[in-house]
From Swiss-Prot:
Its main location: mitochondrion. The lineage of its organism: Eukaryota, Fungi, Dikarya, Basidiomycota, Agaricomycotina. It holds the Pfam family Tim54. Residues 61-458 are mitochondrial intermembrane. It comes from Cryptococcus neoformans var. neoformans serotype D (strain JEC21 / ATCC MYA-565) (Filobasidiella neoformans). Component of the TIM22 complex, whose core is composed of TIM22 and TIM54, associated with the 70 kDa heterohexamer composed of TIM9 and TIM10 (or TIM8 and TIM13). Essential component of the TIM22 complex, a complex that mediates the import and insertion of multi-pass transmembrane proteins into the mitochondrial inner membrane. The TIM22 complex forms a twin-pore translocase that uses the membrane potential as external driving force. The keyword Mitochondrion applies. This is Mitochondrial import inner membrane translocase subunit TIM54. It is a single-pass membrane protein. Belongs to the TIM54 family. It is found in: Mitochondrion inner membrane. Keywords: Membrane, Mitochondrion, Mitochondrion inner membrane, Protein transport, Translocation, Transmembrane, Transmembrane helix, Transport. InterPro entries: Mt_import_IM_translocase_Tim54.
């Protein structure tokens, strides 16, 4: 038989008073009207505190970035509205940007993107153009600058032909173009770029005026290393007898009106030696563009991850630095560059080179060793085919192509250009190598300064 004993009665709901009693007739549940807020648990408090703090830090940082950028763009827009020299056919001011490779980074354009993100917007607003040469390897800035200065010196001495000026509207004569180039300025991104730039100046002005091309120099070095020389058994020369000697007859001489083409070409005289006094650099040195030193540090690797996170929430520091650098290039005065600037500017940034960067010579040597071991069999196969000692394989017949010695030589030259260029460039930019400096450069090299109001107002 079922137990019909009544159980414990539920407590009566709390009585609603005040405005709650009026809201009860609107259909709002009784529990909602009696709900009392309480603090969440400790874990939820920690979660919401961290989330809101990080969100506000991100919002504040990006708001400051937007404010700084807008303020500087409005400040320099007036320069972009000024009439261009030469009218509609004139050219705007054009600066050269040297953005060298960061050690250990596979991306060669990292410094270039830094310039385009943090400095370029203000130059565009001010109507200033820029040129960003390609620098795929360590030392590319040095080699390009060396070649440009060498060409300039050879043309000034009459050792190289000069371009014929065109008498067309809007085309500047060489003297005016050089003057505007000096007035435009040069942007150097990071300490590695500064080291390469100064070394390029030294080589260009101190290494003589002999004709020079880096690719040709490397090619000549590789030509005599014996990698592609074949090892063949010596063949004894045949002994000529009276019966074997055949005298040429008149009938054997080709009778043709083009017989002169078979004659050996006359030996052309070698280039005359350049007098020793022409190798001496001019004194004083020709004017050179002022430098804008743009700091740049690139964090790489797992160990530097905390600094990457800090940079993410402190983007305004980079925006402010880029804005100040742009104002220095647009409005700032110039001062003489001193030895201390070359030796100590951004010296701390070199401490951020990771293990991959510092092991670059060992990695290049390992790649070179493995490559030369791998091409030995390829050279033997190519030489055997060219000598007629083997036929085409099935794969070669399907591809309708046989690898020849010339193909391997061209491939090897490309790799050696990259290896030798990287090795030479790393010797210039590695932290143990001091920046190049000459006492005679005092007063010749100049750097842009940030305007005083921009140092405190941004």
């Amino acid at each position: 038989m079922a137990d019909l004993t009544p159980g414990a009665r539920k407590p009566a709901p709390a009585e609603l008073t005040g405005f709650r009693s009026a809201l009860a007739h609107t259909g709002i549940p009784h529990g909602v009207l009696l709900w009392k807020p309480r603090l969440p648990s400790r874990n939820w408090l920690v979660f919401w505190s961290v989330s809101l703090s990080l969100s506000y830090a991100y919002y504040y940082d990006r708001a400051e970035c937007k404010r700084i950028k807008q303020e500087v763009v409005e400040r320099v827009e007036k320069y972009g509205r000024e009439p261009m020299p030469g009218g509609s056919l004139g050219e705007p001011r054009r600066v050269v940007v040297w953005a060298g490779r960061w050690g250990g980074d596979d991306d060669a354009d990292r410094a270039g993107r830094y310039f385009r993100k943090y400095v370029k917007p203000y130059l565009v607003a001010a109507g200033i153009d820029y040129t960003l040469p390609s620098v795929p390897l360590h030392g590319s800035i040095t080699r390009q600058l060396h070649a440009a200065i060498l060409l300039q010196r050879r043309q000034a001495l009459g050792l190289a032909p000069t371009a014929t000026p065109l008498s067309l509207p809007g085309v500047l004569d060489p003297a005016e173009a050089k003057r505007r180039e000096v007035e435009s300025g040069v942007v150097v991104v990071g300490r590695a770029s500064l080291k390469e730039y100064l070394e390029g100046l030294r080589r260009g002005w101190e290494c003589g005026v002999d004709e020079w091309a880096w690719e040709t120099e490397v090619e000549k070095t590789l030509a005599g290393d014996g990698v592609f020389e074949s090892v063949e058994s010596p063949v004894e020369p045949a002994v000529e007898t009276a019966e074997t000697v055949v005298e040429p007859t008149a009938d054997a001489v080709p009778k043709s009106n083009f017989g002169f083409l078979a004659r050996p070409a006359p030996v052309t005289p070698g280039a005359p030696a350049i007098p020793a006094h022409l190798h001496t650099p001019p004194s004083p040195l020709p004017p050179t563009p002022p430098l804008l030193l743009l700091p740049f540090t690139n964090h790489l690797g797992f160990l530097q991850l905390p600094y990457m996170i800090l940079d993410f929430f402190n983007e305004r520091a980079k925006v402010r630095q880029g804005a100040q650098s742009a104002l220095a290039l647009i409005e700032g005065p110039t001062r003489d560059m001193h030895r201390e600037d070359a030796e100590h500017w951004e010296e701390k940034s070199e401490s951020w080179y990771n293990k991959t960067a510092r092991q670059l010579p060992e990695r290049l040597q390992k790649s070179r060793t493995e490559y030369y071991e791998a091409i030995k069999s390829r050279i033997d196969l190519a030489r055997a085919y060219e000598n007629g000692d083997r036929e085409m394989t099935e794969e070669e017949k399907k591809a309708n192509k046989v690898e020849r010695i010339q193909d391997i030589q061209a491939e090897r030259l490309k790799k050696e250009l990259r290896w030798k260029g990287s090795e030479e460039g790393w010797e210039i930019v590695k932290p143990e190598t001091p920046a190049t400096w000459r006492d005679r450069w005092e007063g010749w090299l100049k750097v842009y300064q940030v305007p005083e109001d921009a140092q405190k107002g941004l």
